[in-house]
Amino acid sequence: MDGGGVDTATTAAWMEKHRHMYERATRHPFTVSIRDGTVDMSAFKRWLSQDYLFVREFVAFIASVLLKCCKQEDSSDMEIILGGVASISDEISWFKNEATVWGVDLASVSPLKANLEYHRFLRSFTEPEISYAVAVTTFWTIETVYQDSFGFCIQDGNKTPPELLGTCQRWGSAGFRQYCQSLQSIVDRCLANAPADAVQSAEEAFVRVLELEIGFWDMSSSRS
């Protein structure tokens, strides 16, 4: 242990400590219904359109993480984070193509309440006083929730509708899981050298992302 008294298993410890909330975020009834083959397709279309808006906002967030990374003495994380930036253009194109397939008019979509709340949270990371450790923790948590959620939809025994397998494989793939693990390693390393107040702020960000993800899934299932 060093820095804020944190060892290299900090993220794993958080996932255990906040297990109930983590499972609510990654085994939400919405994504479980995809795996079970019982998903309401109108809910899926709502998720598709709202997540498209989220991803557009996510671009600025990743840029803020990258900027904080560049200011670190050791900027070796940059290549991994740049991988996230590079994938965004493809992701936006994917959403547009899927919207066409599903007959969703993205131009007419407005962000719902839970989405706007998430947007406000992401925008707060442009503030210079928010540390790189907190920012990269947030980035890792967002990506990991999606990987775990959609990865579950393609595990053995799934009844995921064939037309949704591409969506689930996009975030549930082994390649994306490896990317999330790379981010997790960065987070653990940063936290091992961070002061106690930064570690606490990072844990609070971890929990906040879980809350926002649950709200986003809830929004997809309803119209709130």
Swiss-Prot record:
Pathway: Cofactor biosynthesis; thiamine diphosphate biosynthesis. InterPro entries: Haem_Oase-like_multi-hlx (IPR016084), TenA_E (IPR026285), Thiaminase-2/PQQC (IPR004305), Thiamine_Salvage_TenA (IPR050967). GO terms for molecular function: thiaminase activity. It is an enzyme of class 3 (hydrolase). The active site is at residue 213. Coiled coil: none annotated. The keyword tRNA processing does not apply. Disulfide bonds join 153-168. GO terms for cellular component: cytosol. Keywords: Disulfide bond, Hydrolase, Thiamine biosynthesis. Belongs to the thiaminase-2 family. Involved in thiamine salvage by hydrolyzing the thiamine breakdown product 4-amino-5-aminomethyl-2-methylpyrimidine (amino-HMP) to 4-amino-5-hydroxymethyl-2-methylpyrimidine (HMP). Has a high formylamino-HMP amidohydrolase activity. No activity with other thiamine degradation products such as thiamine mono- or diphosphate, oxothiamine, oxythiamine, thiamine disulfide, desthiothiamine or thiochrome as substrates. Does not display thiaminase II activity, as it is unable to hydrolyze thiamine. This is Bifunctional TENA2 protein. It comes from Zea mays.
